[in-house]
Amino acid sequence: MNNKLLVIARVIIFISIGLWFFTHNQNASLQEIDLESVNNKKPDIIITSVYDNYRVDSDLKTAWGFSCLIETPAERILFDTGGSSDILLFNLEKMNIDPRSIQKIVLSHIHGDHVGGLNGFLEQNNQVTVYIPHTFPSSIREMIINHHAKIHEISEPMKISDFVYSTGELPGPPNEQSLLIDSQKGAVLITGCAHPGIVNIVLKAKDIIKKETIYLALGGFHQPPLSVVKELRKIGVKKVAPSHCTGDSVREIFAEEYQEDFIEFGVGQVIKIEKNSTSRLRF
């Protein structure tokens, strides 16, 4: 009888310890994606298009692909690297952006027009942390490691930097992560190609930030059905800056629907988001 009680006691202790670890790990994971406290002053954000098949400055080079630079008071983050390091580095130099001033790279998905510039960039600056979706092939990991850069694999939503978050890896194909920025004016969503569907990504972003609206959705929208234009309005996207793979005809419909809330985005475009204004500059 005593032996049975001892066994039962041990089982109860084991289960209790297991539950404690499970709860502790769950809380730790959630803390990673908690938005900054409302008491913290949200920073001004600058987003610059450095690689795209659209452009607003004829002095810059254009090619199929996407890359933009996000600047906060804390860091410079490169989102995707376009398809060619030669073009990426040319545009950065033209815009007086030193590759060595960039601390982090976030890659949205595996397609060459988004990761093709990585190798050449790392030859210029390997003092970066590269954030990749968990399902990326080993060849990309090996490239990053061979350049002695840091690597961080992402599957779930997580904090990248102060006020900057990954949506986590969303199912495609291919699987893809997007960036979410908590700015002075509200949430800014940046997509590489939106293979999981731009509406799905917006809904995921809203779930992460626990807000009803997205201030600005920017990037490649993967030529969605025309009905998506009105649907984004309906689910709370206030401004749009579609580029890259969105498609000319869809961009035109976005421009008609959003009017002054449509932002032309292409190489050379700079969007500065401040508390009292959102300005558009060009190099």
Regions inferred by a protein language model and the residue ranges of each:
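C-terminal regulatory/interaction regions
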Residues: 4-10, 25-35, 245, 249-283
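Cap/insert and terminal regions of metallo-dependent hydrolase folds
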Residues: 117, 187, 193-274
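Active-site neighborhood of phospho(di)ester-bond hydrolases with catalytic His/Asp-centered motifs
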Residues: 78-81, 103-110, 131-134, 189-193, ...
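Short, structured coil segments at secondary-structure junctions
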Residues: 95, 126, 146-147, 235-236, ...
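Conserved beta-strand hairpin/beta-sheet module of binuclear metal-dependent hydrolase folds
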Residues: 48-94, 176-191
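Active-site metal-binding motif and surrounding structural segment of the metallo-beta-lactamase
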Residues: 86-131, 206-216, 233
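Metallo-beta-lactamase
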Residues: 132-177, 183-184, 263-282
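Zn-dependent metallo-beta-lactamase
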Residues: 5-74, 156-169
